[in-house]
A protein has these predicted regions:
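Core recognition of P-loop NTPase motor domains used across DNA-transaction enzymes
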Residues: 1-75, 143-146, 205-210, 279, ...
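The Walker A/P-loop phosphate-binding site
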Residues: 27-129
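Cofactor-binding loop segments of dinucleotide-utilizing enzymes, especially the Rossmann-like FAD-
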Residues: 112, 220, 253
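Structural recognition of the conserved hydrophobic beta-strand(s) that form the central parallel beta-sheet
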Residues: 180-181, 213-220
Length: 301
């Protein structure tokens, strides 16, 4: 296939280019508490819905059916994604982002360790089940995600206050519902900056609540024995990181190809608003970079 179709899609979206934004100035004009003081009657519709329907299971789903009644990415929460270096945390999160896009929940990815084109190509292959990147693959993905997927194009370290402003703008002006930060170490450099790490995560929780979005925070695990999944307390830096987030998900890959264990284990070891904590076994297709549920006895979970 030639580049014609890709060019056609790009031309259609030409008018949707974002304006230049001074994020810091924008943030300063938006952080007012005036609209937080409300009358009790303002909650009538919400109360009426609750009384009629009760507590509903809400939130975006993982792309694995066995978790749909067990875990959700609820708005107003922060999920910590951890795992050993090279165990496919970012790849898994991109795969999940495709699921969010399928239900028209807008996503913004701030990957400070990977250029946007690499992220787009990887997600395009996952979405199209393709073992290679082609014009057709990218065009199909662009048509699917063009209006709902954003990237914050910055590699390297970034000041925390600047990131807060970007998150605020993405949610308020673009309607983003999932903001992905990859990773914490590019915002708070230094494993021993415990107070800064705590303050950063607390502020992310505050923003998630205020903006009614879900924030996904990727973080690295301390070096250790990689033949078993880690837990949230193995995350580098302050224990306040895992203490303050709402959910903790851990991605572990079977690097040694042990036959009795699955290719990948996705482990939930914290869910503040849900009862389930546990693991699910997944197979991994390296050619398409897709993860699939395993229903055999070789679960390892």
């Amino acid at each position: 296939m030639s580049s014609t179709r890709l060019e056609d899609i790009a031309k259609k979206l030409e008018g949707a280019k974002l304006p230049d934004v001074d994020f810091d100035a924008y943030y300063q004009t938006q952080t007012s508490d005036n609209d937080k003081i409300k009358r009790v009657v303002d909650y009538f519709n919400e109360l009426d819905h609750y009384l009629e329907h009760g507590e509903e299971v809400k939130g975006a789903k993982l792309p694995f059916s066995k978790t749909h009644n067990l875990f959700r990415f609820r708005q107003g929460e922060v999920t910590l994604w951890t795992g050993y270096n090279g165990h496919k945390k970012s790849m898994m999160l991109g795969f999940c982002a495709i699921e969010f896009l399928k239900v028209k929940e807008k996503v913004c990815i701030a990957s400070f360790e990977m250029k946007p084109i690499k992220t787009i190509i990887r997600m395009a292959r996952q979405y199209t089940h393709s073992s290679e990147c082609s014009y057709e693959t990218v065009a199909d993905f662009m048509q699917f995600a063009a209006s709902d997927l954003y990237v914050f194009d910055h590699q390297g370290n970034l000041n925390a206050s600047r990131l807060y402003a970007v998150i605020y703008y993405s949610a308020k002006e673009l309607g983003v519902k999932h903001f992905i930060i990859d990773s914490l170490m590019r915002v708070i450099a230094g494993e021993d900056k415990y107070n800064e790490q705590k303050d950063f995560v607390v502020q992310l929780c505050n923003l998630a609540i205020e903006l009614d979005i879900h924030i996904h925070l990727v973080h690295h695990t301390k070096k250790g024995k990689e033949n078993e999944p880690s837990n949230r307390y193995d995350a580098k830096g302050s224990g306040a990181i895992s203490d303050n987030v709402h959910n903790s998900l851990i991605v572990w890959s079977n690097k040694d190809k042990e036959p009795e264990k699955p290719d990948v284990i996705l482990k939930c070891d914290k869910q503040r608003e849900g009862e389930w904590e546990g693991s699910i076994a997944l197979s991994f297709d390296a050619s398409t970079m897709r993860f699939n549920e395993m229903f055999s006895e070789r679960s390892g979970a």
